[in-house]
Amino acid sequence: MRKLWAPNWLSAKRHHANQAATRLIGRHALMAWLAAALALSAGAAQAQLNVEISGVGASQIPVATANFQGEAQAPQNLTAIIRSDLARSGRLRNVDPGGATVAESANVDLGSWKSRGADAFVAGSVTPSGNGQYEVRFRLYDTVKGQSLGGLAFNVNQGQLRVTAHKIADYIYEKLLGERGVFATRLSYVSRVGGRYQLLISDSDGQNSQVALTSNEPIISPSWSPDGRRVAYVSFEAKKPVVYVHDLATGKRTLVSNQKGNNSAPSWSPDGQHLAVALSRDGNTQVYQVNADGSGIRRLTRSSAIDTEPQYSPDGKSIYFTSDRGGAPQVYRMPAGGEEAGSAQRVTFKGSYNVSPRISPDGKYLAYITRSGGFKLQLQDLTNGDVTSLTDTSNDEAPSFAANGKYILYATRVGGRSVLAAVSTDGRTRQVLSLQSGDVREPSWGPFMQ
């Protein structure tokens, strides 16, 4: 069997135990375990989020969010979460409300808030409604035009207060910028503490993490279903890589692919009915399609090369994948029906080593990792072929688009530490999430919640 072009990314300590699978997973070089970037669900330090903003200046919209009336009696500080969300957007800027507490029902002097430098103002309230329930209300104002931009009311339990704050931030983002926010979306990643591996799900800011699965063997390649209810991943619990689908609400797992050899790199079709996977059952790793219940397996690529890391296009008509069929790894595109339906076409031409393709939700951009004095996150315009380098780090890996296509989550090293990071697609805003202890890898940004 041919040796895979991707060098070993597992630590030397675990190299021999996972050598066969490592040769076939199709990950780019230096896929090392990342220092923890997100909080564990229990007993761990909370994630620390640092936001670096450059080159935006006056283009940021200034927003003042007053303290919500009654929130001091609630177990979550909603306004703190809202302000944090707005700040990390890179496109909205917080204006200090000076400690003011204002309910959404108040008669607001918008002129006074404009004089403080705010173009938008947010007021709200949190009211206990019995049996652990809370009523959360808010209203958004345009201080420049002197008018209301609407608001919402929520009846939620204690555990839903945090996501409610994210939804309020999403509302503000959309009303002021004209596009959907992603604060209420979720992240998935794999944590390792000692010899224990955990698949975790967290809020988009790295907080409120929950354990979906714990294993004594590695878990890799989490991939969200389009409806955000399931995550596909690869588990080594059978002493080889096997693909499962995990229902996050029930905890039920479905074995999707346990073919001869290695089963890796699952990617959902846009309709949630199928998964593209990389299998070595017939020799070299090739791309296959399988139904989400594990039935109906079908081979899609038919080359003598290594074909791996498949990704469906948002319209479901194409599959992007990594292949060394030209002598070195590059990104290719083929019809979703496979190479029998049409030949694969090379997509990346800048650089001699390009891997880990991810397509933006609108299908217009390709994020990938190039090897050029290190491993760097790139963004390619699929219309004109223009390529932009989004980071100044040299150990980037595992890119994943936010649901609105405006940000990319990835793993890298900063200041000698391994971290998770997110960068806006214009390169102006960077967020770094770090944790004091533990390892984490393979981040994946979830879809809009339905």
UniProtKB/Swiss-Prot annotation:
Disulfide bridges in this chain: none
InterPro entries in alphabetical order: 6-blade_b-propeller_TolB-like, PD40, Tol-Pal_TolB, TolB_N
Locations listed in the record: Periplasm
Signal peptide residue numbers: 1-47
Keyword Cell cycle attached: yes
GO biological process: cell division; protein import
Top-rank taxon: Bacteria
Record key words, sorted: Cell cycle, Cell division, Periplasm, Signal
CC terms in the record's Gene Ontology section: periplasmic space
NCBIfam families registered for this protein in UniProt: propeller_TolB (TIGR02800)
Role this protein plays: Part of the Tol-Pal system, which plays a role in outer membrane invagination during cell division and is important for maintaining outer membrane integrity.
Family under the similarity heading: Belongs to the TolB family.
HAMAP family the record matches: TolB
Subunit text: The Tol-Pal system is composed of five core proteins: the inner membrane proteins TolA, TolQ and TolR, the periplasmic protein TolB and the outer membrane protein Pal. They form a network linking the inner and outer membranes and the peptidoglycan layer.
Annotated protein name in UniProt: Tol-Pal system protein TolB
Source organism (scientific name): Cupriavidus pinatubonensis (strain JMP 134 / LMG 1197) (Cupriavidus necator (strain JMP 134))
